Amino acid sequence: MQTPLIDLQDIRKSYGGGDTPEVHVLRGIDLSIHAGEFVAIVGASGSGKSTLMNILGCLDRPTSGEYRFAGENVAGLDTDELAWLRREAFGFVFQGYHLIPSGSAQENVEMPAIYAGIPAAERHARAAALLERLGLASRTGNRPHQLSGGQQQRVSIARALMNGGHIILADEPTGALDSHSGKEVMALLDELASQGHVVILITHDREVAARAKRIIEISDGLIIRDSAKEDPTVQASTNPGALQAVDLRKRLSEGSEASGAWKGELVDAVQAAWRVMWINRFRTALTLLGIIIGVASVVVMLAVGEGSKRQVMAQMGAFGSNIIYLSGAAPNPRTPPGIVTLDEVAALASLPQITRIMPVNGAEAGVRFGNLDHMSYIGGNDTNFPEIFNWPVVEGSYFTEADERNGAAVAVIGKKVRDKLLKDVSNPIGQYILIENVPFQVVGVLAGKGASSGDQDSDNRIAIPYSAASVRLFGTHNPEYVVIAAADARKVHETEMAIEQLMLQLHNGKKDFELTNNAAMIQAEARTQNTLSLMLGSIAAISLLVGGIGVMNIMLMTVRERTREIGIRMATGARQRDILRQFLTEAVMLSVVGGIAGIGLALLVGGVLILSEVAVAFSLVAIAGAFACALITGVVFGFMPARKAARLDPVTALTSE
């Protein structure tokens, strides 16, 4: 005697237990079904026939008992192997059709083949042939809502046959159809049975059940009648279904992994994700808004921070990285700061490491021209100023050595002073301005340099002879600080050491002075700007986090709305990882689209800021980083909903509303 294709021994199924009453749905089912049989399982509502079908189709597991499929104990199969059985051995035909609403008839039929790893061209051709065979050649692109009930059920049958459909499990296939459509569906099932498919028909209608060769009656979870009209063993030996059984047994022994399936599944996941996003366009747009704003904020904030940093660094660097500043400082809080004298400046000038040295005597002071007033930094310098700071004069000329010796009341004004006080004067050279009510004649205008650090504006200064500043304005001959140009920018530290050694000698070993250099100041400013950029980016990242929470929220809602679709995919052979991939792909797709749109918005905002003369510097690293963060956000916040979807029970998912 040939081994039955399906063999159930003392199958029991109970629900509840613990705090809830235990309900026994199946109470010891013994059933054998051979290849090629057409079996009808008949019973009233609540008899346990649907539960039996779910166990037969590997959608559910029995509480106890033994289920052998092609001689293999199903209890020993893991979830992936059960999915393989559903995909390769079974084809489901449901009373409610259970088609995916967003997919066309062709796409619904192709679904089992996608999970089986069948190449796209082959599955397209096979699905089209099945639909043509069932009279739906002109309806391949129609969605379920565009089909009649009979047409939807035929699509469901075509889907059941896509991977061979060795065993057709039809649960009340005519229950939702009119009599004419019902007869057409039953005729199709008769035809499939005659071709060797095992057809298991679940119904409460005895007239429908009469079409089967074998009728099994079930009541209160027990088989009360099994009326086989022929010897099933004899039928199996002469029926073409025996060949299908041999093929199934062979493939089951070879393994359940479908080679190359992931490619088709990934493409299907992307296409399905795009369809869902398009169908729910408004909701998708609202979800994307959070990601778009988050990515755009991160990119723009970092671009503004980087632009500000580069601008400040360029302006500070314009003064030279070989510049050293010397000023008096207090050795401790209880003593007054030291004083740097002009004699010490002369002594320092003799050091070979120094090319130029310039004392500065300056302070903020009020400046007037006509009826206009302005606050500016007044710096008493010598004629080394343009060379030390690489700061040319664009109008007129710099004051001379003679002006310095004579304490001449002449001034070279910065660009901002020119714009504030002499904007309407075509030629400022020769004009007189009042500095602390002392008249000075403008002899030159410095080139623009911009802000050097923070709120300081280097262009808001006026250079006058050191002697004039000391006598006419400040009443002190000692410099406020000294500017020193090192001979070699690469040896600024060595130059500082030489200056410090000489100053300690001049001050009898007392370090009541301070040395700083432009390079150190630039590095300190760079650290400050980096911290500022990081702070701006962190603030912007919060909005990206909010966008991620929005993705999680929408995906949780999507899982709830599409629970039945998840059940359909599982019934057609999807593994848990396939469902996980499907919903994770949708979350990532949201993030990818949002990331791309966010980058586009950031570039647009950046363009507007540039037109508004705000320093902006986009970085490919920052853009790529923001996009990567959006992608990671999609994965992280989409994983929990996707895992929830993957862990759904197939039966529970299929019966959800």
From Swiss-Prot:
Annotated gene: pvdT
Keywords carried by this UniProt record: ATP-binding, Cell inner membrane, Cell membrane, Membrane, Nucleotide-binding, Translocase, Transmembrane, Transmembrane helix, Transport
EC number: 7.6.2.-
UniProt keyword annotation of Heme present: no
Family affiliation: Belongs to the ABC transporter superfamily. Macrolide exporter (TC 3.A.1.122) family.
GO molecular function, one term: ATP binding
Subcellular location: Cell inner membrane
Pfam families hit by this protein: ABC_tran, FtsX, MacB_PCD
UniProt-recorded name of the protein: Pyoverdine export ATP-binding/permease protein PvdT
Species of the source: Pseudomonas fluorescens (strain Pf0-1)
